[in-house]
Amino acid sequence: MKDFYQYFQFLFFFMLSVISFSLFVALTPLSNVFVFFVFNLLGQILLNVFSFLSFYLIVYPIVNWYAYKKHIFTKRFIFNWNYTVILFFTLIFLIKINSNVEKSYFIKIFLINFGIVLGNFFIFTLLILEFVVWIYLNYVFFKDVNFILDTFKFLEFKIKILFENILSYFPFSNSLDVKKDIKVYGDSVDDLKDSQVFDEKKNIINDEEYQALWSFSAFLRNNKKPSNINLDKTIFEGSDLKEASSLNKDILNENALNLDENVDEIDESCEYKYLDNLEDNKLVISGKVKACEIRTKGIISQVAISHVYNENVALNKKNDSYVIDISVFDQKEIKNDVEDIEYDKEIQKQSMILQETLKEFNINAKLIDIIKGPVVTMYAVRPDKGIKLSKITSISDNIALRLAAIRVRIIAPIPGREAVGIEIPNKRREFILISEIIDSKEFRGDFRIPFALGKEISGENIVFDLVNSPHLLIAGATGAGKSVCVNSLIASIIFSKSPDEVKLIMIDPKIVELKLFNDIPHLLTPVITDVKRALEALRWCLDEMERRYVLLDNLLVRDISSYNKKIKDENLNLMILPYLVIIIDEFADLILSARKDLENLISRLAAMARAVGIHLVLATQRPSVDVITGVIKANFPSRISFMVASSMDSRIILGSSGAEKLLGKGDMLYISSLNPFPXRIQGGFLKEREVYRLVEEVKKFGSPNYIDDEIFIDSVKEPDLVALGPSDEPMFDEALEIVKTTRKASASYLQRRLKIGYNRAARIIEIMEDMGYVGPVNGSKPREVLI
């Protein structure tokens, strides 16, 4: 429709030009010579032109209304174009008045005939008034007075395009030899200067090639193909123009992007550009770009993707004995190409409305990049010099109103770029499955405790190592995706790491959230739901931390990685220390019940436990200052914030606002010690049935060895029974028989079986150890039964 509108306008001006030329010839002294040819040979043409003109005047308002309604052009463009039509009609009226005189000499009649003089005066006055009104309306509505120069430049550009198209039909001319000078703006001053123009023909591309390359880079980015393209700072050589049948398919088959086998059947009336031989090798993948309708479609179609690496059977891990099939997770369905085309049209429409809105508030800015994400699309704009960033951020609600968006988030500026980012929610939201991140090359990296977080706005999979965090704080309102994020963290760990590599302690005051993971071999204790038991578990972790520090000191190493490496390299007769992750799902319920004890335990663990491989993950839905205290924030540099109610809550979590503008359902902001600027990420969605399948698979690798029974003291107090030996303990023989039968030497186990107090059961175990029936305490391992 966009091309039709342009041709419609061109036809109208062509008709007016023919009429103007004919009337002008009739007014000149040469009319005696040309009058016969003009009114006889062109008579039929003019008759047809006037006939069509009457039809045009009827259709003209409808076409303009449709162009505005569908956002084919901006309001400013349509307004100025149509105002030009009004001026053209005025000029035609001027010539028509003078053409009524029968004499041939224009000046003579102009001086004699008073009516003609009065008519000319009226028309000239009307022209001046129209120009004044034109300038005034552009200043009032669009805050722009340079539109006349822009209009002339645009007309000059379209005339060049017209002549190139005309010359391309002649065999002795090639339209691609006529190259246009385009302005290339660089992000770095060292590379390119603003408004710098390159005149060398080999370094200049025309407008169609630029649009094709821009779309091609977007196509590569959306389909996860390697590319390092920045059209704002890269100059490409001219591309060759070839027919579809003359493409060398052997060359294309060597690349990651291949043509469809039925490429010859695709729209043979359209020319294709074959992109290769690009300067600096910035684009090393060749492809076939559809040159016609590149602006309306906005994507490169008819390019088939060859999946080079697709592994659906199993994920290889360092521990070959611990392998879990990726099929336990739901797999993503194939995208619909029709939806992608509609999505690209929607993006073009939004970009035009966004630029109009900025103009309405007298903000001159250039749209330099569009980054399409699964949930939001970020429009990167470069404001003119002297524009305050606060002026842009203050109109976020107006932008949301014009675009009918739920929330609009503005990043002013984008870190590392000379631009402001405006994030607008997509009309059609794309859900990210956890399998997309786990079954990616990013997840196959060398991670000690991997966490498949999600996808950022550019489509890149985000996976980070919890060891480098070293602790993680997760906060967000109810239903924003916090619990799913915690489940994704646990799923990432137990999917990729064996129980010998990572151990887990889960504390769930809400009782129902983490119960699904009970009985997996990674657990050191069943999922804890009681506050007192949670405190005892954290005290045990503190003792375990001190024990590990003693082990590290004995080997003269600084951290757990060096400790395990030294054991392997020197074949020492010592046990490898597994990493320990403590996950607390609802931290607010715990800290409000036992603030002093819990805060001291958390602070000590967060400050000292990272070196010995103990890491904390705290999640809460109440981001208040009495829950997330300054001491906790200081020891948790890595934080995730989902949607919150207010900017105050966002500042408590992240230290800055922005989380209140999130959309929920996994939409998050993530900061870390390596990247303190909040990065927007869409979290992976994990269904409950996927958790069930994963847990059942993990249980096949063994049962849990709960050693935490000894750390929980029974709340029922009874008088201490001091026993010096087996003869002094009447229940010793029964306890020894239980240990011999069950092969479990645990004080809390005897406590439950014999229904006695913890102190008494612990004393019985000590007597067994002294007599050589059971082994000593062996760290996180259960006691060895020697009988």
Swiss-Prot record:
Keywords for this protein: ATP-binding, Cell cycle, Cell division, Cell inner membrane, Cell membrane, Chromosome partition, DNA-binding, Membrane, Nucleotide-binding, Transmembrane, Transmembrane helix
Main location (coarse class): membrane
Keyword Repressor: no
InterPro entries, per the entry: FtsK/SpoIIIE/SftA, FtsK_alpha, FtsK_dom, Ftsk_gamma, P-loop_NTPase, WH-like_DNA-bd_sf, WH_DNA-bd_sf
FtsK domain mapped to chain residues: 459-651
Cited Pfam families: FtsK_alpha, FtsK_gamma, FtsK_SpoIIIE
Entry's Gene Ontology cellular component terms: plasma membrane
Disulfide links within the chain: none
GO molecular function: ATP binding; DNA binding
Protein's cellular compartments: Cell inner membrane
Superkingdom in the source lineage: Bacteria
Alphabetical list of CDD domains matching this protein: TrwB_TraG_TraD_VirD4 (cd01127)
GO biological process, alphabetically ordered: cell division; chromosome segregation
Spans within the Cytoplasmic topological domain: 130-787
Residues binding ATP, per UniProt: 479-484
Comment block on domains: Consists of an N-terminal domain, which is sufficient for the localization to the septal ring and is required for cell division, followed by a linker domain, and a C-terminal domain, which forms the translocation motor involved in chromosome segregation. The C-terminal domain can be further subdivided into alpha, beta and gamma subdomains. The alpha and beta subdomains form the DNA pump, and the gamma subdomain is a regulatory subdomain.
Physiological role: Essential cell division protein that coordinates cell division and chromosome segregation. The N-terminus is involved in assembly of the cell-division machinery. The C-terminus functions as a DNA motor that moves dsDNA in an ATP-dependent manner towards the dif recombination site, which is located within the replication terminus region. Required for activation of the Xer recombinase, allowing activation of chromosome unlinking by recombination.
Subunit-level organization: Homohexamer. Forms a ring that surrounds DNA.
Family per similarity comment: Belongs to the FtsK/SpoIIIE/SftA family.
Protein name: DNA translocase FtsK
